[in-house]
């Protein structure tokens, strides 16, 4: 968290809030020479700094001195946002006790819930949801709290959100669903949980790629194994290729082998009339691709 300090006294207030120096903070605020809501050029307040830094007693002192809990920084962030982002659950509870709102958004649409989910703070998420946070909160690009948790691999938090009513297939504006993002990032446990909770195994992005296609291209074999348990499409996708083409292009021999064992067809061309074998010079992969053809399986 960066901030610009304006005056020597404001500078001292920010320093005390950041370091958790309660005695100095009280001295400055009681002097009557500095506003409890003094701001820097970004709109940062001492309450935001103390909340971000996790100094409970300083946060309480600032509130008792009349700090406005719901002031927003230039970016839209509030004290609650910063406390949630950093996982300071007791401070989150304290802010709620004195009227913090869950509805404020940053310029990119982020809420305190989104921040807590992105950074995996399950206790904070529980507190936020109990105090009115909307489990369907999403960024301006459509990424939901569940999407952010899936992207970062926070399995227990994902279970928590799904149990609170989060939509497992809610995509981002570009069509990317939580399952697709988890597959891209290689989070096999997340993929497993999402599939068991009803995620569409063949949901595709606007570019036509599916979770299996992306995992195959990245060589995330543990993810592929979870997806293959749910019999995803091995045929031509909307992007004109198959998962086998993706695996070959990605260069993972194990990924290619997994797909062949799942009965992917090495003789199926993409819409450019290219066979998977046309997309690699790897002798090891070419050898594996030839085996089904030699055995008459295609």
Swiss-Prot record:
Q: Which SMART domains match?
A: ANK
Per UniProt, which keywords does this protein have? ANK repeat, Repeat
SUPFAM superfamilies from the UniProt entry: Ankyrin repeat
Q: Check the record and name the PROSITE patterns matching this protein.
A: ANK_REP_REGION, ANK_REPEAT
One matching Pfam family is Ank_2
Question: Repeat ANK: residue ranges?
Answer: 8-38, 42-71, 75-104, 108-137, 141-170, 174-203, 207-236, 239-268
From which domain of life does this come?
Eukaryota
Provide the protein name: Ankyrin repeat domain-containing protein 29
Which gene holds the coding sequence for this protein?
ankrd29
């Amino acid at each position: 968290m960066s901030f610009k300090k304006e005056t020597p006294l404001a500078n001292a207030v920010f320093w005390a809030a950041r370091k958790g120096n309660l005695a100095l903070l009280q001295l400055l605020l009681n002097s009557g020479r500095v506003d409890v809501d003094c701001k820097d050029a970004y709109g940062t307040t001492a309450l935001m700094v103390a909340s971000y830094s996790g100094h409970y007693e300083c946060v309480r002192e600032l509130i008792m001195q009349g700090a406005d809990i719901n002031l927003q920084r230039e970016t839209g962030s509030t004290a609650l946002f910063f406390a949630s982002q950093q996982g300071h659950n007791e401070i989150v509870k304290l802010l709620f006790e004195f009227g913090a709102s869950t509805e404020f958004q940053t310029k990119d649409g982020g809420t305190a819930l989104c921040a807590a989910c992105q950074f995996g703070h399950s206790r904070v998420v529980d507190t936020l949801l109990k105090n009115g946070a909307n489990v369907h909160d999403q960024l301006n690009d459509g990424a939901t709290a569940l999407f952010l948790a899936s992207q970062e691999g926070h399995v227990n938090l994902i279970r928590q959100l799904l149990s609170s009513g989060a939509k497992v297939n809610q995509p981002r504006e570009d069509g990317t669903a939580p399952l697709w993002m988890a597959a891209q990032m290689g989070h096999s446990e997340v993929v497993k949980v999402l599939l068991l909770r009803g995620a569409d195994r063949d949901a595709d992005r606007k570019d036509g790629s599916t979770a299996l296609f992306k995992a195959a291209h990245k060589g995330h074999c543990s993810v592929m194994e979870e997806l293959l348990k749910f019999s995803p499409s091995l045929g031509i996708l909307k992007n004109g290729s198959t998962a086998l083409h993706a695996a070959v292009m990605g260069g993972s021999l194990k990924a290619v082998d997994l797909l062949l064992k799942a009965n992917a067809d090495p003789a199926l061309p993409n819409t450019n009339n290219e066979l998977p074998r046309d997309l690699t010079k790897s002798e090891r992969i070419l050898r594996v691709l030839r085996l089904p053809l030699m055995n008459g399986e295609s």
